[in-house]
UniProtKB/Swiss-Prot annotation:
Pfam families: Glycos_transf_2 (PF00535). It is found in: Cell membrane. Keywords: Cell membrane, Glycosyltransferase, Membrane, Multifunctional enzyme, Repeat, Transferase. It is an enzyme of class 2 (transferase). Its EC number is 2.4.1.212, 2.4.1.226. Changing D249 to E/K/N: Complete loss of GlcNAc transferase activity. This is Hyaluronan synthase. Changing D247 to E/K/N: Complete loss of GlcNAc transferase activity. The gene is hyaD. It catalyses: [hyaluronan](n) + UDP-N-acetyl-alpha-D-glucosamine = N-acetyl-beta-D-glucosaminyl-(1->4)-[hyaluronan](n) + UDP + H(+); N-acetyl-beta-D-glucosaminyl-(1->4)-[hyaluronan](n) + UDP-alpha-D-glucuronate = [hyaluronan](n+1) + UDP + H(+); 3-O-(beta-D-GalNAc-(1->4)-beta-D-GlcA-(1->3)-beta-D-Gal-(1->3)-beta-D-Gal-(1->4)-beta-D-Xyl)-L-seryl-[protein] + UDP-alpha-D-glucuronate = 3-O-(beta-D-GlcA-(1->3)-beta-D-GalNAc-(1->4)-beta-D-GlcA-(1->3)-beta-D-Gal-(1->3)-beta-D-Gal-(1->4)-beta-D-Xyl)-L-seryl-[protein] + UDP + H(+); 3-O-{[beta-D-GalNAc-(1->4)-beta-D-GlcA-(1->3)](n)-beta-D-GalNAc-(1->4)-beta-D-GlcA-(1->3)-beta-D-Gal-(1->3)-beta-D-Gal-(1->4)-beta-D-Xyl}-L-seryl-[protein] + UDP-alpha-D-glucuronate = 3-O-{beta-D-GlcA-(1->3)-[beta-D-GalNAc-(1->4)-beta-D-GlcA-(1->3)](n)-beta-D-GalNAc-(1->4)-beta-D-GlcA-(1->3)-beta-D-Gal-(1->3)-beta-D-Gal-(1->4)-beta-D-Xyl}-L-seryl-[protein] + UDP + H(+). It comes from Pasteurella multocida. InterPro entries: Glyco_trans_2-like (IPR001173), Glycosyltransf_2 (IPR050834), Nucleotide-diphossugar_trans (IPR029044).
Length: 972
């Protein structure tokens, strides 16, 4: 019998002195919060009956365990019993199980469903909501969102603090430090070597580099494996805004510092993960690395015995993560990118330590501590990415840390990690196999204010869920009645209930406090006067587990009287759409959301009194997908004092305020969502164009289309998002294409600022080149058709004007022409495209796309895909104007087919559809067109930002590999 069970037994036997002693001991084991109430009760009993010696009192051993005056809920008793923290007899346990089954057997009723239009009929056709991320770690989407919101990083001390954790291995450490000396960067950096209690004296190694590096050395006592504590020691000393972590056996390449800092300066919400290769340095002198900066990258890769961090195939070992990096587009499409966070080569902004905390020092064996730390970064909203340029080289053999150490350590820490990382590593278990995890999978939060009369029914409904991997977080918001006393009396000793109290701040303030207090990954919302059906959490949770891209799952509710009698089923809009949510609060109770999605918003708005939930769920709908379940899982108690039915005038005002704020966050400034009438209870609305929009959008009306017999070329450009760098792009086109007749720009008209309009007009007057603006295709879509659709729309615009063109170039906003006198080059050919083989991944995506697969099978055999050269980036693609019309006719048929069955491709269509259309046309006509490559190039590094020297070098044709595009981000 454990200490807590002994304490309970002693209390129930009236041996309060012994019980107090045992409860005090239990507090040291389980935490004082769990037994604080019992300790108080023991002291009260002893104070009232100081002479009682209960040791001689008889106790019925079969008597039901009673936890002081505040019995635990049934599920909690069973969970404690499963791990021997509460002793129950078999009969007691069976009795509790039967009671729990009765409590949880009720199933939520189906809600009434009717057919509805997903998009309201009065929703403006040109009002397109901002795109959602492709996945939970879509760092590309997040970067665009921050730019739209005007969020810019603030840095005080730009530089990299490099924490190098070590234990013995002086030679290997010296090589790593030598490679840090060889860094090629203008960014400042420091090196903090943190020693986890080495027996060998490492100070001579450090002194060798004192004049070569900004270096510090700190050591902690050898208390076994304490890598987390060693890293934390270094993190607390860091002086720069950015943190880089290296293990002592990870030698960084010469661009390691520069690559990390440059990436974090661009987006300090990233956590950047570096890959590794395996090399053998045991017979190389560290001085050789100091004298030869290129030595590291010239060493051959080796096969290691490290099966935990590498997979061995053939003669070398590979970083097991590389395959996942490729499959997930450098982790952009990963649902759990923190799994690849290995602290031997990573970087992040120091600000995240204030949000997610430091490394967990409970991990005192090899492995797990970095994944758990990465999970917290992910939970609080960091985005994970791997990039080129941050390779580090793992020096083999592993030295004093052998393979057995790693495997044994991982087996120990895996259990700790499962306790503390509920997302991904936790699955739903029956209550017989469950226990109370230190970090629950689900948290239900309850803001509580003056609710003493009904808080018990509310909390009990949360505890009596079919999902038991759950905690309840109650925030007492400065109640003036005895709410806090009731909560503490009923749940103060319950390990699945966490209680906090604060001065009154209103529902938004209490909600923010409670959600911040919660430990779970999935968060459920419950008002203190309401209660849940037993399967509410389970129904929602199963949807989250099926689709990791979901930010929110919600059900519907019924309205009941305080005694539980039915008033009526609540309003239920049967299917979610963002457009409908923009016009009405359709996200009904019960609602669950992910804590990560919540951290991507600014939380509940504490400046408004009503419409707080509407505002919050609009925010959540901007950062992830919603799913609605037509189940009645929530009982909404109407007692006349509900915040949602009080102060209707303020409620209505804020309803329209929060919708307009949502539109503004999405960059939609050309519509206002306005009240239709003055009735407080009415939510009738109308969308009105803003004054800014009403201004004539085309101040470029002075541009007249002028036919020039010497001008032969049309250019179609897709220009996403903002138009920064537009004139720079136009000037580049003119510089290399003297025969340009017309440029048609597919743009988002919301970014046509007065300054940009003036720049376009000035360009037109200077060069007398016709410019057409097109905005037919919505920019706020994440599908892979958009660029192809934009080019198709552009050529349709040209056709409507009956313009006489000879060639057309299809280009991107961020490519750079380097082929002088393009027309002289083009007129030798019918078409310029890039043609290369399809990878296995591309073939799989094509076969998974029915409309395009059907088209291919019409003209080609199944095996043709493996041998056909039909893939190539589309920048700088050109063809005769007549041929473009024929190809786009074929492409339009495919787009129509896609739209008819709502089948969106999972690949960039512009990279293969033009090539396939050309081959199909050749098959249909029997004519083989004269083909060549495109007009622009790109160096192997695929750099996104070039120096002026690099641009001029490219223009001269220097250092450009054949058939490689230059992707030059001239918009930056």
């Amino acid at each position: 019998m454990n200490t807590l069970s002994q304490a309970i037994k002693a209390y129930n036997s009236n041996d309060y002195q012994l019980a107090l002693k045992l409860f005090e001991k239990s507090a040291e084991i389980y935490g004082r919060k769990i037994v604080e109430f019992q300790i108080t009760k023991c002291k009260e009993k002893l104070s009232a009956h100081p002479s009682v010696n209960s040791a001689h009192l008889s106790v019925n051993k079969e008597e039901k365990v009673n936890v002081c005056d505040s019995p635990l809920d049934i599920a909690t008793q069973l969970l404690l019993s499963n791990v021997k923290k509460l002793v129950l007899s078999d009969s007691e346990k069976n009795t509790l199980k039967n009671k729990w089954k009765l409590l949880t057997e009720k199933k939520s009723e189906n809600a009434e469903v009717r057919a509805v239009a997903l998009v309201p009929k009065d929703f403006p056709k040109d009002l397109v909501l901002a795109p959602l991320p492709d996945h939970v770690n879509d760092f590309t989407w997040y970067k665009k969102r921050k730019k739209r919101l005007g969020i810019k990083p603030e840095h005080q001390h730009v530089g990299l603090s490099i924490i190098v954790t070590t234990f013995n291995r002086p030679a290997i450490l010296s090589i790593t430090l030598a490679c840090l000396v060889n860094q090629k960067t203008h960014y400042p950096f420091e090196v903090i070597v943190t020693d986890d209690g080495s027996q060998e004296d490492l100070s001579p190694i450090i002194r060798q580099y004192e004049n070569k590096l900004d270096i510090r050395y700190v050591r902690q006592k050898d208390n076994g494996f304490q890598a987390s504590a060693a890293r934390n020691m270094g993190l607390r000393l860091a002086k720069y805004d950015f943190i880089g972590l290296l293990d002592c056996d990870m030698a960084p390449n010469p661009l390691w510092v520069h690559s990390y800092v440059a990436e974090l300066l661009e987006d300090d919400d990233l956590t950047i993960i570096g890959p590794r290769k395996y090399i053998d340095t045991q017979h190389i002198d560290p001085k050789d690395f100091l004298n030869n900066a290129s030595l590291l990258e010239s060493l051959p890769e080796v096969k290691t015995n490290n099966s935990v961090a590498a997979k061995g195939e053939g003669t070398v070992s590979l970083d097991w993560r590389l395959e996942q990096f490729e499959k997930t587009e450098n982790l952009r499409l990963s649902d759990s990118p923190f799994r690849f966070f290995a602290a031997g080569n990573v970087a992040f902004a120091k600000k995240w330590l204030n949000k997610s905390g430091f490394f967990d020092e409970e991990f005192n064996h090899w492995g797990g501590e970095d994944v758990e730390f990465g999970y917290r970064l992910f939970r609080y909203g960091s985005f994970f990415k791997t990039i080129d340029g941050i390779m580090a080289y793992h020096q083999e053999p592993p030295g004093k840390e052998n393979e057995t150490d790693r495997e044994a350590g991982k087996n120990i820490t895996l259990d700790i990690m499962r306790e503390k990382v509920p997302y991904i590593y936790r699955k739903l278990l029956p209550i017989e196999d469950s226990h109370i995890n230190r970090v629950p999978l689900v948290s239900i939060y309850i803001p509580a204010y003056n609710c003493a009369n009904y808080i018990q029914r509310c909390v009990d409904s949360a505890l009596n869920q079919t999902v038991v991997d759950l905690e309840v977080c109650i925030c007492n918001d400065g109640s003036t009645d005895n709410t806090l006393e009731v909560i503490n009396k009923l749940y103060g000793n319950n390990p699945r209930v966490r209680i906090m109290s604060k001065p009154n701040g209103g529902i938004a303030s209490a909600s923010n406090a409670a959600v911040s207090f919660a430990k779970g990954y999935y968060i459920g919302q419950l008002d203190s006067d309401d209660y849940l059906e037993p399967d509410a959490v389970e129904l929602c949770l199963k949807e989250f587990l099926k689709d990791k891209t979901l930010a929110c799952v919600y059900t519907t509710n019924r309205n009941v009287n305080p005694d539980g009698s039915l008033i009526a089923n609540g309003y239920n809009w049967p299917e979610f759409s963002r457009e409908k949510l923009t016009t009405a609060m359709i996200a009904h109770h019960f609602r669950m959301f992910t804590i990560r999605a919540w951290h991507l918003t600014d939380g509940f708005n504490e400046k408004i009194e009503n419409a707080v939930d509407y505002d919050m769920f609009l925010k959540l709908s901007e950062v992830g997908k919603f799913k609605h379940l037509n189940k009645i899982c929530y009982n909404r108690v109407l007692h006349g004092d509900n915040t949602s039915i009080k102060k209707l005038g303020i409620q209505k005002k804020n309803h329209f305020v929060v919708v307009n704020q949502s539109l503004n966050r999405q960059g939609i400034t050309y519509y206002n969502y306005d009240e239709f009438d003055d009735l407080d209870e009415s939510r009738k609305y109308i969308f009105n164009k803003t004054a800014e929009y009403q201004e004539e959008i085309d101040i470029l009306k002075d541009i007249k289309i002028i036919q020039n017999k010497d001008a032969k070329i049309a250019v179609s450009i897709f220009y996403p998002n903002t138009l920064n760098g537009l004139v720079k792009k136009l000037n580049n086109i003119i510089e290399y294409n003297k025969n340009i007749f017309v440029i048609v720009l597919h743009v988002d008209k919301n970014h046509l600022t007065p300054d940009i309009k003036k720049e376009i007009l000035a360009f037109y007057h200077k060069h007398q080149v016709n410019i057409l603006l097109n905005n037919d295709i919505s920019y706020y879509t994440s599908n892979r058709l958009i660029k192809t659709e934009a080019h198709l729309s552009n050529i349709n615009k040209l056709s409507q004007l009956n313009l006489n063109c000879e060639y057309i170039i299809f280009d991107n906003h961020d490519s750079l022409f380097v082929k002088n006198d393009s027309y002289a080059y083009m007129k030798k050919y019918d078409v310029g495209m890039n043609f290369s083989a399809l990878t296995h991944d591309w073939i799989e995506k094509i076969n998974a796309h029915p409309p395009f697969k059907k088209l291919i099978k019409t003209y080609f055999n199944d095996n043709d895909l493996k041998s056909m050269n039909v893939k190539g980036a589309s920048q700088g693609m050109f063809m005769t104007y007549a041929l473009a019309h024929e190809l786009l006719t074929i492409i339009k048929e495919v787009i129509t087919s896609c739209q008819s069955i709502d089948s969106v491709p999972e690949y960039n269509t512009e990279d293969i559809w033009f090539q396939f259309a050309l081959l199909i046309l050749e098959k249909k006509t029997g004519h083989v067109f004269n083909k060549t490559s495109t007009l622009t190039y790109m160096p192997w590094e695929r750099k996104l930002q070039w120096t002026n020297e690099q641009i001029e070098s490219a223009k001269r044709g220097e250092n450009i590999p054949v058939n490689k595009f230059i992707i030059n981000s001239i918009t930056l």
